[in-house]
Amino acid sequence: MSSERHKYFIEYGINVLRSRHSSIRKLKRLHRPSLHGFRVWPSSWLLIDYFKLSNPVRHSRVLDIGCGWGLAGIYCAKNHSSKVTCVDRDSEVFPYVQLHAEINNVEITAIKTGFETLSGIEMKSYEIMIGADICFWVNMVDTLKSLIHRAFESNIKSVIIADPGRSPFEMLAQYFVNTGIGKIMNWNVTHPYPIQGRILIIR
């Protein structure tokens, strides 16, 4: 076990395994995400820091879309007593989600579906939708607009998305700012390493 100590770390009260940890290496031999779920993306830490300071998710039902390894959702479950469902179109990410849920002693539900097919019926039992690094191609902008509109037509009360500030994200954010229901904030963290980005809050 001591040989593994440098292969994981604790940030914001959650345990995170590095890529070289034996458990992650084992998963990578068995499960290979085909899209972008092969790592923890930086904007997850922007979301987590925002949640720590503003606490909008406490005791809420949270939908973590495009979840990847699911750290933002796991943070919500562990530190804010949220009921979390992780959503991704690539089922190969879910073993990584479940591994991190287990080492953090939380329960996470998983749904395999894409942004285009996540229905209002599936979203109606949730209050908050979150996402990190989920708008990186221009053709995703309209897809996410449609998803967010469906979310508000169901029971979702707010949508919170973090991003480094990619052009597609800025297009999405500006659209919701222009409609009068969106707000963009610059955000940065110093740990686990320096990260700068933007957070879009829609409510």
Regions found by a protein language model. Give the residues of each.
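S-adenosylmethionine-dependent methyltransferases
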Residues: 1-203
